UniProtKB/Swiss-Prot annotation:
The gene is mamM. Its main location: membrane. This is Magnetosome protein MamM. The C-terminal domain (CTD) is probably responsible for hetero- and homodimerization; it assumes a V-shaped, dimeric metallo-chaperone-like fold that can open and close. Val-260 forms the hinge between the dimers. Binds up to 3 divalent metal cations (probably iron in vivo); upon binding there is a conformational shift to a tighter dimer. If the CTD cannot fold correctly the function of the whole protein is decreased, suggesting the CTD confers functionality on the transmembrane domain (TMD), perhaps activated by ligand binding to the CTD. It comes from Magnetospirillum gryphiswaldense (strain DSM 6361 / JCM 21280 / NBRC 15271 / MSR-1). Forms homodimers via its C-terminal domain (CTD) in the presence of metal cations. Interacts with MamB via their CTD. Isolated CTD forms homodimers.
Length: 318
Protein backbone atom coordinates (compact mmCIF):
# COMPACT_ATOMS: atom_id res chain seq x y z
CA UNK A 1 0.00 0.00 0.00
CA UNK A 2 1.17 3.52 -0.78
CA UNK A 3 0.99 4.87 2.79
CA UNK A 4 1.82 3.23 6.11
CA UNK A 5 -1.55 4.23 7.53
CA UNK A 6 -3.46 2.41 4.79
CA UNK A 7 -2.94 -0.98 6.43
CA UNK A 8 -4.38 0.34 9.70
CA UNK A 9 -7.40 1.83 7.92
CA UNK A 10 -8.07 -1.38 5.99
CA UNK A 11 -8.21 -3.33 9.25
CA UNK A 12 -10.37 -0.81 11.10
CA UNK A 13 -12.77 0.35 8.36
CA UNK A 14 -15.32 -2.36 9.12
CA UNK A 15 -15.47 -1.60 12.84
CA UNK A 16 -15.62 2.16 12.28
CA UNK A 17 -18.41 1.72 9.74
CA UNK A 18 -20.32 -0.60 12.08
CA UNK A 19 -20.15 1.85 15.00
CA UNK A 20 -21.10 4.90 12.93
CA UNK A 21 -23.95 3.16 11.10
CA UNK A 22 -25.40 1.72 14.31
CA UNK A 23 -25.50 5.14 15.97
CA UNK A 24 -27.06 6.74 12.88
CA UNK A 25 -29.67 3.98 12.54
CA UNK A 26 -30.79 4.34 16.16
CA UNK A 27 -30.86 8.14 15.88
CA UNK A 28 -32.87 8.12 12.64
CA UNK A 29 -35.38 5.54 13.86
CA UNK A 30 -35.91 7.43 17.14
CA UNK A 31 -36.17 10.86 15.49
CA UNK A 32 -38.38 9.49 12.72
CA UNK A 33 -40.83 8.08 15.27
CA UNK A 34 -41.02 11.08 17.59
CA UNK A 35 -40.82 13.59 14.73
CA UNK A 36 -43.49 11.87 12.63
CA UNK A 37 -41.37 11.52 9.49
CA UNK A 38 -41.85 8.56 7.14
CA UNK A 39 -38.87 9.73 5.12
CA UNK A 40 -36.58 9.61 8.17
CA UNK A 41 -37.81 6.13 9.03
CA UNK A 42 -36.99 5.03 5.50
CA UNK A 43 -33.63 6.79 5.85
CA UNK A 44 -32.95 4.61 8.89
CA UNK A 45 -32.99 1.67 6.48
CA UNK A 46 -29.98 3.16 4.71
CA UNK A 47 -28.06 3.09 7.98
CA UNK A 48 -29.27 -0.44 8.72
CA UNK A 49 -27.99 -1.42 5.29
CA UNK A 50 -24.67 0.27 6.05
CA UNK A 51 -24.49 -1.53 9.39
CA UNK A 52 -25.02 -4.95 7.81
CA UNK A 53 -22.52 -4.12 5.09
CA UNK A 54 -19.93 -3.19 7.75
CA UNK A 55 -20.49 -6.58 9.37
CA UNK A 56 -19.94 -8.20 5.98
CA UNK A 57 -16.70 -6.22 5.58
CA UNK A 58 -15.43 -7.44 8.96
CA UNK A 59 -16.30 -11.06 8.21
CA UNK A 60 -15.38 -10.97 4.53
CA UNK A 61 -11.98 -9.31 4.84
CA UNK A 62 -11.05 -11.69 7.66
CA UNK A 63 -11.84 -14.76 5.56
CA UNK A 64 -10.60 -13.45 2.21
CA UNK A 65 -7.19 -12.58 3.66
CA UNK A 66 -6.48 -16.21 4.53
CA UNK A 67 -3.58 -17.72 2.53
CA UNK A 68 -4.02 -20.25 -0.27
CA UNK A 69 -4.29 -23.91 0.62
CA UNK A 70 -4.76 -27.22 -1.18
CA UNK A 71 -8.56 -27.01 -0.97
CA UNK A 72 -8.66 -23.35 -2.02
CA UNK A 73 -5.90 -22.88 -4.64
CA UNK A 74 -7.52 -19.63 -5.80
CA UNK A 75 -7.68 -18.27 -2.26
CA UNK A 76 -10.81 -17.13 -0.40
CA UNK A 77 -11.48 -13.88 -2.26
CA UNK A 78 -14.91 -14.85 -3.57
CA UNK A 79 -16.39 -14.82 -0.08
CA UNK A 80 -16.62 -11.03 -0.44
CA UNK A 81 -18.80 -11.37 -3.54
CA UNK A 82 -20.98 -13.97 -1.83
CA UNK A 83 -21.57 -11.72 1.17
CA UNK A 84 -22.24 -8.71 -1.06
CA UNK A 85 -24.88 -10.73 -2.88
CA UNK A 86 -26.51 -11.78 0.40
CA UNK A 87 -26.73 -8.16 1.58
CA UNK A 88 -28.21 -7.03 -1.75
CA UNK A 89 -30.88 -9.75 -1.81
CA UNK A 90 -31.96 -9.00 1.77
CA UNK A 91 -32.36 -5.31 1.00
CA UNK A 92 -34.17 -5.83 -2.26
CA UNK A 93 -36.77 -7.83 -0.32
CA UNK A 94 -37.01 -5.36 2.60
CA UNK A 95 -37.22 -2.26 0.41
CA UNK A 96 -39.85 -3.92 -1.74
CA UNK A 97 -42.04 -4.04 1.36
CA UNK A 98 -41.18 -0.43 2.27
CA UNK A 99 -42.02 0.68 -1.26
CA UNK A 100 -45.55 -0.69 -0.97
CA UNK A 101 -45.96 0.95 2.46
CA UNK A 102 -44.72 4.33 1.17
CA UNK A 103 -47.16 4.25 -1.76
CA UNK A 104 -50.06 3.50 0.59
CA UNK A 105 -49.21 6.48 2.83
CA UNK A 106 -48.67 8.82 -0.11
CA UNK A 107 -52.08 7.98 -1.58
CA UNK A 108 -53.93 8.43 1.74
CA UNK A 109 -54.11 12.18 2.49
CA UNK A 110 -55.38 11.53 6.01
CA UNK A 111 -51.93 10.13 6.86
CA UNK A 112 -50.02 13.21 5.66
CA UNK A 113 -48.34 15.03 8.56
CA UNK A 114 -45.81 17.86 8.78
CA UNK A 115 -42.79 16.41 10.62
CA UNK A 116 -41.12 18.15 13.56
CA UNK A 117 -38.05 20.30 12.80
CA UNK A 118 -35.89 17.97 14.88
CA UNK A 119 -35.93 15.72 11.83
CA UNK A 120 -34.17 18.42 9.82
CA UNK A 121 -31.30 18.63 12.31
CA UNK A 122 -30.95 14.85 12.38
CA UNK A 123 -30.81 14.81 8.58
CA UNK A 124 -28.05 17.44 8.55
CA UNK A 125 -26.01 15.43 11.06
CA UNK A 126 -26.46 12.33 8.91
CA UNK A 127 -25.29 14.18 5.79
CA UNK A 128 -22.08 15.36 7.46
CA UNK A 129 -21.22 11.99 8.98
CA UNK A 130 -21.94 10.01 5.82
CA UNK A 131 -19.97 12.36 3.57
CA UNK A 132 -16.98 11.86 5.87
CA UNK A 133 -17.48 8.08 5.88
CA UNK A 134 -17.82 8.05 2.09
CA UNK A 135 -14.42 9.66 1.52
CA UNK A 136 -12.83 7.50 4.24
CA UNK A 137 -14.17 4.20 2.87
CA UNK A 138 -13.54 5.27 -0.74
CA UNK A 139 -9.87 5.87 0.08
CA UNK A 140 -9.59 2.41 1.67
CA UNK A 141 -11.45 0.82 -1.26
CA UNK A 142 -8.99 2.33 -3.75
CA UNK A 143 -6.02 0.97 -1.79
CA UNK A 144 -7.43 -2.52 -1.16
CA UNK A 145 -9.59 -3.01 -4.28
CA UNK A 146 -12.07 -4.80 -2.01
CA UNK A 147 -15.57 -5.20 -3.51
CA UNK A 148 -17.10 -5.11 -0.03
CA UNK A 149 -15.41 -1.83 0.89
CA UNK A 150 -16.35 -0.39 -2.51
CA UNK A 151 -19.93 -1.34 -1.68
CA UNK A 152 -19.57 0.35 1.71
CA UNK A 153 -18.48 3.59 0.03
CA UNK A 154 -21.46 3.43 -2.35
CA UNK A 155 -23.80 2.89 0.58
CA UNK A 156 -22.50 5.90 2.53
CA UNK A 157 -22.83 8.03 -0.60
CA UNK A 158 -26.42 6.87 -1.03
CA UNK A 159 -27.11 7.49 2.66
CA UNK A 160 -25.86 11.08 2.44
CA UNK A 161 -27.99 11.68 -0.66
CA UNK A 162 -31.07 10.24 1.04
CA UNK A 163 -30.56 12.38 4.14
CA UNK A 164 -30.24 15.42 1.89
CA UNK A 165 -33.59 14.56 0.34
CA UNK A 166 -35.11 14.21 3.81
CA UNK A 167 -33.82 17.66 4.76
CA UNK A 168 -35.31 19.21 1.62
CA UNK A 169 -38.59 17.42 2.30
CA UNK A 170 -38.80 18.81 5.83
CA UNK A 171 -38.10 22.32 4.56
CA UNK A 172 -40.80 21.92 1.91
CA UNK A 173 -43.33 20.55 4.39
CA UNK A 174 -42.75 23.39 6.88
CA UNK A 175 -42.21 26.43 4.72
CA UNK A 176 -44.17 25.54 1.57
CA UNK A 177 -47.10 23.90 3.37
CA UNK A 178 -46.66 20.63 1.45
CA UNK A 179 -46.92 17.78 4.01
CA UNK A 180 -47.16 15.21 1.21
CA UNK A 181 -43.45 15.79 0.42
CA UNK A 182 -42.35 13.64 3.38
CA UNK A 183 -44.04 10.41 2.17
CA UNK A 184 -42.98 11.30 -1.39
CA UNK A 185 -39.35 11.41 -0.25
CA UNK A 186 -39.88 8.09 1.54
CA UNK A 187 -41.13 6.63 -1.77
CA UNK A 188 -38.09 7.97 -3.62
CA UNK A 189 -35.77 6.51 -0.98
CA UNK A 190 -37.24 3.04 -1.32
CA UNK A 191 -36.89 3.16 -5.11
CA UNK A 192 -33.27 4.31 -4.70
CA UNK A 193 -32.60 1.45 -2.28
CA UNK A 194 -33.99 -1.03 -4.79
CA UNK A 195 -31.76 0.32 -7.55
CA UNK A 196 -28.73 0.31 -5.27
CA UNK A 197 -29.48 -3.27 -4.28
CA UNK A 198 -29.62 -4.21 -7.96
CA UNK A 199 -26.22 -2.60 -8.65
CA UNK A 200 -24.58 -4.39 -5.71
CA UNK A 201 -26.20 -7.69 -6.75
CA UNK A 202 -24.92 -7.40 -10.33
CA UNK A 203 -21.41 -6.47 -9.17
CA UNK A 204 -21.36 -9.54 -6.92
CA UNK A 205 -22.76 -11.72 -9.71
CA UNK A 206 -20.02 -10.64 -12.12
CA UNK A 207 -17.40 -11.33 -9.46
CA UNK A 208 -18.70 -14.84 -8.85
CA UNK A 209 -18.74 -15.50 -12.60
CA UNK A 210 -14.98 -14.80 -12.89
CA UNK A 211 -15.28 -11.61 -14.92
CA UNK A 212 -12.26 -10.39 -16.82
CA UNK A 213 -9.95 -7.81 -15.28
CA UNK A 214 -11.04 -5.47 -18.07
CA UNK A 215 -9.43 -4.01 -21.15
CA UNK A 216 -7.83 -1.09 -19.28
CA UNK A 217 -6.01 -3.38 -16.84
CA UNK A 218 -5.05 -5.82 -19.60
CA UNK A 219 -3.59 -3.00 -21.69
CA UNK A 220 -1.52 -1.82 -18.73
CA UNK A 221 -0.18 -5.36 -18.26
CA UNK A 222 0.75 -5.56 -21.95
CA UNK A 223 2.38 -2.13 -21.84
CA UNK A 224 4.50 -3.03 -18.79
CA UNK A 225 5.53 -6.38 -20.32
CA UNK A 226 6.51 -4.96 -23.70
CA UNK A 227 8.85 -2.44 -22.09
CA UNK A 228 11.08 -5.26 -20.83
CA UNK A 229 14.20 -5.71 -23.00
CA UNK A 230 14.03 -8.87 -25.08
CA UNK A 231 10.23 -9.01 -25.29
CA UNK A 232 8.88 -9.09 -28.84
CA UNK A 233 5.31 -8.34 -27.90
CA UNK A 234 2.63 -10.13 -25.89
CA UNK A 235 1.07 -13.03 -27.79
CA UNK A 236 -1.68 -13.99 -25.34
CA UNK A 237 -2.99 -12.64 -22.03
CA UNK A 238 -5.56 -14.09 -19.68
CA UNK A 239 -6.54 -12.07 -16.59
CA UNK A 240 -9.47 -12.14 -14.18
CA UNK A 241 -10.44 -11.01 -10.72
CA UNK A 242 -10.54 -13.43 -7.80
CA UNK A 243 -12.03 -11.34 -5.01
CA UNK A 244 -9.97 -8.16 -4.78
CA UNK A 245 -6.92 -9.65 -6.52
CA UNK A 246 -5.95 -10.24 -10.15
CA UNK A 247 -4.81 -13.64 -11.41
CA UNK A 248 -3.22 -13.70 -14.85
CA UNK A 249 -1.01 -15.65 -17.21
CA UNK A 250 0.57 -14.53 -20.44
CA UNK A 251 2.65 -15.72 -23.36
CA UNK A 252 5.34 -13.36 -24.62
CA UNK A 253 7.34 -13.42 -27.82
CA UNK A 254 11.14 -13.71 -27.68
CA UNK A 255 14.03 -14.08 -30.14
CA UNK A 256 14.05 -17.63 -31.61
CA UNK A 257 17.83 -17.64 -31.09
CA UNK A 258 17.48 -17.27 -27.30
CA UNK A 259 18.38 -20.22 -25.12
CA UNK A 260 15.84 -21.67 -22.69
CA UNK A 261 17.71 -20.01 -19.83
CA UNK A 262 17.64 -16.62 -21.56
CA UNK A 263 13.92 -16.94 -22.26
CA UNK A 264 13.31 -17.85 -18.62
CA UNK A 265 15.24 -14.78 -17.45
CA UNK A 266 13.12 -12.56 -19.69
CA UNK A 267 9.95 -14.14 -18.27
CA UNK A 268 11.14 -13.41 -14.73
CA UNK A 269 11.91 -9.81 -15.71
CA UNK A 270 8.39 -9.47 -17.14
CA UNK A 271 6.89 -10.81 -13.90
CA UNK A 272 8.85 -8.28 -11.85
CA UNK A 273 7.98 -5.40 -14.19
CA UNK A 274 4.25 -6.12 -14.33
CA UNK A 275 3.84 -6.82 -10.61
CA UNK A 276 5.80 -3.64 -9.84
CA UNK A 277 3.60 -1.58 -12.17
CA UNK A 278 0.15 -2.95 -11.32
CA UNK A 279 -1.07 -3.42 -7.77
CA UNK A 280 -3.28 -6.29 -6.63
CA UNK A 281 -1.72 -8.94 -8.89
CA UNK A 282 -1.78 -12.07 -6.75
CA UNK A 283 -0.55 -14.48 -9.40
CA UNK A 284 1.19 -13.97 -12.76
CA UNK A 285 2.52 -16.85 -14.84
CA UNK A 286 4.65 -15.92 -17.85
CA UNK A 287 5.80 -18.28 -20.60
CA UNK A 288 7.67 -17.56 -23.85
CA UNK A 289 7.34 -18.51 -27.51
CA UNK A 290 9.64 -17.76 -30.43
CA UNK A 291 8.62 -14.71 -32.44
CA UNK A 292 10.29 -13.29 -35.52
CA UNK A 293 11.15 -9.61 -35.85
CA UNK A 294 8.40 -7.69 -37.63
CA UNK A 295 5.52 -9.81 -36.31
CA UNK A 296 3.05 -7.16 -35.15
CA UNK A 297 0.13 -9.44 -34.35
CA UNK A 298 -1.90 -7.91 -31.54
CA UNK A 299 -2.20 -9.90 -28.29
CA UNK A 300 -5.30 -12.02 -27.77
CA UNK A 301 -7.21 -11.57 -24.53
CA UNK A 302 -9.10 -14.30 -22.70
CA UNK A 303 -10.99 -14.51 -19.43
CA UNK A 304 -10.93 -18.30 -19.14
CA UNK A 305 -9.92 -19.43 -15.63
CA UNK A 306 -6.56 -21.02 -14.92
CA UNK A 307 -6.41 -24.75 -14.30
CA UNK A 308 -5.40 -26.11 -10.89
CA UNK A 309 -1.93 -27.08 -12.18
CA UNK A 310 -1.44 -23.62 -13.70
CA UNK A 311 -2.45 -21.96 -10.44
CA UNK A 312 0.02 -23.94 -8.35
CA UNK A 313 2.77 -23.42 -10.96
CA UNK A 314 2.20 -19.67 -11.05
CA UNK A 315 2.41 -19.49 -7.26
CA UNK A 316 5.74 -21.32 -7.38
CA UNK A 317 7.01 -19.00 -10.12
CA UNK A 318 6.06 -15.97 -8.06
Amino acid sequence: MRKSGCAVCSRSIGWVGLAVSTVLMVMKAFVGLIGGSQAMLADAMYSLKDMLNALMVIIGTTISSKPLDAEHPYGHGKVEFILSMVVSVVFIVLTGYLLVHAVQILLDESLHRTPHLIVLWAALVSIGVNVGMYFYSRCVAIETNSPLIKTMAKHHHGDATASGAVALGIIGAHYLNMPWIDPAVALWETIDLLLLGKVVFMDAYRGLMDHTAGEAVQNRIVEAAERVPGVRGVIHLRARYVGQDIWADMIIGVDPENTVEQAHEICEAVQAAVCGKIRRIESLHVSAEAREIGDTTKPSFSDQPLSFDEVMLSKVDN
